Amino acid sequence: DGEYYAFDIIGLQVINQDDVVLGEITEILKTGSNDVYITKAKDGRQILIPALKKVVTEINIEDGFMKVIWDENQEV
């Protein structure tokens, strides 16, 4: 439980705690400590979201979304 393959995650819509769609995960960056979800926003920006339990609150593969605690204007 809580383990997903990259192909499960890529393509998910990222939705924040205010139900704002932040974008779509386009790739996963592997780092030494935790993965980072590279998310393409509607305006073309890239949002780098760390794959941490305190940030990612839900992953729903069946419905195609990931819920995160993230301000839509937050910079990395």
PLM ranges: what are they?
Residues D1-V76:
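Peripheral interaction segments used for macromolecular assembly
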